[in-house]
Amino acid sequence: MAIERTFSIIKPNAVAKNVIGSIFARFEAAGFKIVGTKMLHLTVEQARGFYAEHDGKPFFDGLVEFMTSGPIVVSVLESENAVQRHRDLLGATNPANALAGTLRADYADSLTENGTHGSDSLESAQREIAFFFGEGEVCPRTR
């Protein structure tokens, strides 16, 4: 099976809970290699650009407000079948439906403040990685 890359966000509510290290440890325990990561505080323009596909939906403004309410941690993760394995680790988007032991079951506060984001396809992963990471900011792991 081919090695894939996926994109992950630790959202403002999870950053505020000081669980970044715990989430990274769970990524690594699940066999992911972290090949790029940074902390940043999204501007309104960045949040609107990243979530542009949701523009016009009833939850869009609240999502932008939440995602700009504090710092986030964006990461590029690498493993076999990375997109699906990462989504399985995150759990259901709605934490009320997330299985015990998933990141959203453990760290989400609500549907909007669900703690984490993960790419839903390889195409989304490529687009999302390119949104946050420039040339040379993702480092292939050779060891």
Curated annotation (Swiss-Prot):
Keyword terms: ATP-binding, Cytoplasm, Kinase, Magnesium, Metal-binding, Nucleotide metabolism, Nucleotide-binding, Phosphoprotein, Transferase
Molecular-function GO terms, alphabetical: ATP binding; metal ion binding; nucleoside diphosphate kinase activity
Gene Ontology CC terms, in alphabetical order: cytoplasm
SUPFAM superfamilies, per database record: Nucleoside diphosphate kinase, NDK
Cofactor: Mg(2+)
Residues that bind ATP: K11, F59, R87, T93, R104, N114
PROSITE patterns assigned: NDPK (PS00469), NDPK_LIKE (PS51374)
Compartment(s): Cytoplasm
Enzyme class of the recorded protein, top EC level: transferase
Subunit structure: Homotetramer.
Family statement drawn from the similarity comment of this UniProt entry: Belongs to the NDK family.
HAMAP family: NDP_kinase
Job description of the protein: Major role in the synthesis of nucleoside triphosphates other than ATP. The ATP gamma phosphate is transferred to the NDP beta phosphate via a ping-pong mechanism, using a phosphorylated active-site intermediate.
Name listed for the protein in its UniProt record: Nucleoside diphosphate kinase
Species annotation: Salmonella typhimurium (strain LT2 / SGSC1412 / ATCC 700720)
